[in-house]
């Protein structure tokens, strides 16, 4: 049997998302899949959907509070940071100064990617000398990196929570003629991110399998709607992308 999907976008607003979920409840959907706008604001969504007795599945961003019976389909965000940190430790022979470009501090992905990178590089003997929030935006990555460069501190690597901020950092380093001395890593393996890996400006990125998360979310929702059981967490693994294995990620 086929699945009828109704998809809406929340325009990055939690209040809009809650209203959309309430509309889905009123429409008596068989299951609801939510990619939360902010991971700290899922309480009202969870209460409303569970109160209506409708199966709920969260995808991509893990809610801060994940109650029993509500599965999460996504990737282990801390592991993304650990992959970045492991790559940098090896590339820098376990010595040097690292700065971290963080996404949105209200999101679990920001906290976990940052923690994964920081713990991994520090364990290897590198120093994290600063971290700043760049709201996932390229222009913020650029302006924060400019400020770091102006500070005169020695920076050997920039660990960015996503490719967009990493690309901004690369622009700032290119403008200052310092890209050759600094390794930049990102997360997402976006089209632009992959192009930068190919060009040799982005040392590495981390592939997040959005298609795998989406299909996993639908599979879980269908199973729950049919009275089946689903694991609490369905992990779709992150993968490190470098110049060596870039070809296998094209078009994924």
Question: How should each PLM-predicted stretch be described?
Answer:
Residues 1-252:
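A residue-level marker of the well-folded mature domains of exported/periplasmic proteins
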